[in-house]
């Protein structure tokens, strides 16, 4: 975590080969410094006097990315920043609708370039149409079938990991939620045998976290040298090892499934069904699913529980949530209609995602040909652009925007605002992106999160110690929950039989 938050604290020192690469890199940087800029947009955190290169500018962004972005928006609606991953063009939220549908804005190319998909160890992040089709055609349509298995798995995990003691006991919130999310996801993705295997869970969880560290390490190198540098960086070597170990575990299961008839509802079958003869790598696809499913889902659950516990009238809010859960689940059971009718829980989640989104800017796109925005701003071909998600803190859109109001979106929903649903992205709230490239798995993610929180809040009393103070941790473009909070739980005595 410390390396992720402070990626410039460690200097590359990983073998003689690195010295050769650094020599080439210095020459490359000199060439880049002498080359003319592609675009005349202002840079809001560029090099200061007597600084050579972008090291200090990148470091400043790592320490206060949100502040730099907000300061830039006060000066211009389109500008450059020097981020940990290099220069970026940042656009104000008024450009969101334009960017989401512009033919020159390519999301797949952006992802491939942004996350080094051509580099060994990062193949997991190559855009795969087969995976998108499996999510859209199979996963989303099968949510109703998966709800009871997800509920059963959640109950089993909580029984084992959180226990039945009616005395308050402390949990490491970050690790326990990550464990819960990764296992429930894995059982749905690869089945019970592999999904409950601790070694598999360790691989998929560690690949996701190690990828962020390796990404920042690799970004210290010029783009042209990254396919070589990856073989000299131990952080990148970890990714390749995770892929090899995942293949060793998954290949025998795939061979067995292909040779014997079965009737299962998970991605091992869905990938094969939707592929239609197209080539794909099931190991990379599974790691890609895990990377998408674990971190952001865990983040939202952790922050939501934190917000609930820190709310000024937490006792009443928890009671309101439990009453809604009991009423809805007794009426509907684990059906899709229940997820729709959990209106307060939906509002709580959307409000948490509003006050503390995962990122300050998103909607990354690669510009395939020169484009002119509605205000006349010209973006050259070959640039990467991002749109800020800062309307979530705009008082013109959300009254008292810095206040966490769990009932905010219930009121909006009751007044007829269809965009008040958690899974409905808009330029005012881009927690799941926007347009055709918005998160395709958001319906599954929202369902999974609600199931997990129903189990947690109906079965356990939760609190944060009185002396604890919650602080959102900012690192570059990312906003992380406070992982240092003391989170305590105890088993509730209500004997609710609503899990059928």
From Swiss-Prot:
Pathway: Secondary metabolite biosynthesis; terpenoid biosynthesis. Its EC number is 1.-.-.-. It is found in: Membrane. Its cofactor is heme. Heme binds at residue 439. SUPFAM superfamilies: Cytochrome P450 (SSF48264). Pfam families: p450. The chain crosses the membrane at residues 15-35. GO terms for cellular component: membrane. Disruption phenotype: Eesults in loss of 7-hydroxydehydroaustin and accumulates a new product, 1,2-dihydro-dehydroaustin. Disulfide bonds: none annotated. It is an enzyme of class 1 (oxidoreductase). GO terms for biological process: secondary metabolic process; terpenoid biosynthetic process. It is a single-pass membrane protein. GO terms for molecular function: heme binding; iron ion binding; monooxygenase activity; oxidoreductase activity, acting on paired donors, with incorporation or reduction of molecular oxygen. Keywords: Heme, Iron, Membrane, Metal-binding, Monooxygenase, Oxidoreductase, Transmembrane, Transmembrane helix. Signal peptide: none annotated. InterPro entries: Cyt_P450 (IPR001128), Cyt_P450_CS (IPR017972), Cyt_P450_E_grp-IV (IPR002403), Cyt_P450_sf (IPR036396). Cytochrome P450 monooxygenase; part of the gene cluster that mediates the biosynthesis of calidodehydroaustin, a fungal meroterpenoid. The first step of the pathway is the synthesis of 3,5-dimethylorsellinic acid by the polyketide synthase ausA. 3,5-dimethylorsellinic acid is then prenylated by the polyprenyl transferase ausN. Further epoxidation by the FAD-dependent monooxygenase ausM and cyclization by the probable terpene cyclase ausL lead to the formation of protoaustinoid A. In A.calidoustus, the austinoid gene cluster lies on a contiguous DNA region, while clusters from E.nidulans and P.brasilianum are split in their respective genomes. Genetic rearrangements provoked variability among the clusters and E.nidulans produces the least number of austionoid derivatives with the end products austinol and dehydroaustinol, while P.brasilianum can produce until acetoxydehydroaustin, and A.calidoustus produces the highest number of identified derivatives. Belongs to the cytochrome P450 family. This is Cytochrome P450 monooxygenase ausR. The lineage of its organism: Eukaryota, Fungi, Dikarya, Ascomycota, Pezizomycotina. The gene is ausR.
């Amino acid at each position: 975590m410390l390396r992720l938050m402070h990626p410039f604290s460690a200097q590359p020192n990983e073998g003689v080969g690195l010295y050769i690469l650094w020599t080439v890199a210095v020459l490359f940087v000199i060439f880049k410094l002498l080359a003319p800029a592609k675009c005349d947009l202002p840079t809001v955190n560029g090099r200061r006097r007597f600084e050579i290169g972008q090291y200090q500018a990148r470091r400043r962004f790592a320490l206060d990315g949100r502040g730099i972005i907000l300061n830039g928006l006060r000066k211009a609606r389109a500008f450059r920043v020097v981020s940990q991953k290099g220069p970026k063009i940042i656009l104000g939220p008024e450009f969101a609708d334009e960017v989401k549908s512009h033919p020159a804005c390519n999301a797949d190319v952006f992802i491939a370039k942004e996350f080094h998909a051509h580099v060994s160890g990062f193949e997991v992040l190559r855009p795969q149409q087969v995976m998108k089709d499996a999510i859209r055609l199979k996963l989303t349509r099968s949510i109703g079938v998966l709800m009871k298995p997800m509920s059963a798995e959640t109950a089993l995990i909580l029984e084992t990991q959180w226990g039945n003691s009616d005395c308050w006991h402390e949990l490491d919130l970050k690790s326990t939620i990550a464990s819960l999310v990764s296992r429930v996801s894995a059982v749905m993705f690869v089945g019970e045998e592999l999904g409950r295997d601790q070694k598999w869970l360790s691989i998929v969880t560690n690949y996701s976290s190690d990828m962020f560290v390796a990404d920042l390490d690799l970004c210290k190198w010029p783009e042209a040298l990254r396919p070589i540098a990856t073989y000299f960086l131990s952080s990148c070597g970890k990714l390749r090892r995770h892929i090899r170990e995942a293949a060793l575990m998954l290949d025998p299961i795939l061979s067995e499934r292909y040779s014997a008839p079965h009737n299962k509802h998970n991605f091992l079958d869905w990938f094969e069904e939707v592929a239609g003869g197209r080539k794909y790598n099931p190991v990379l696809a599974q790691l890609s699913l895990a990377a998408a499913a674990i971190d952001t889902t865990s983040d939202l659950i952790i922050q939501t529980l934190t917000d609930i516990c820190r709310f000024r009238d937490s006792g009443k809010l928890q009671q309101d949530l439990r009453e809604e859960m009991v009423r809805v689940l007794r009426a509907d059971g684990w059906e899709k209609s229940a997820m729709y009718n959990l209106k307060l829980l939906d509002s709580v989640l959307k409000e948490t995602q509003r006050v503390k989104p995962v990122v300050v800017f998103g909607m990354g796109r690669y510009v395939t040909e020169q484009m002119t925005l509605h205000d006349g701003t010209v973006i050259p071909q070959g640039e990467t652009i991002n749109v800020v998600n800062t309307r979530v803190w705009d008082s013109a859109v959300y009254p008292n925007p810095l206040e966490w109001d769990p009932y905010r979106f219930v009121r909006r929903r009751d007044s007829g605002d269809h965009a008040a649903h958690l899974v409905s992205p808009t330029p005012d709230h881009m927690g799941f992106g926007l347009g055709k490239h918005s998160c395709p798995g958001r319906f599954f993610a929202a369902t999974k999160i609600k199931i997990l929180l129903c189990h947690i809040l109906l079965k356990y009393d939760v609190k944060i110690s009185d002396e604890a103070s919650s602080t959102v941790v900012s690192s570059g473009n990312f906003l992380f929950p406070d992982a240092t909070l003391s989170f305590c739980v105890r088993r509730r005595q209500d004997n609710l039989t609503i899990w059928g």
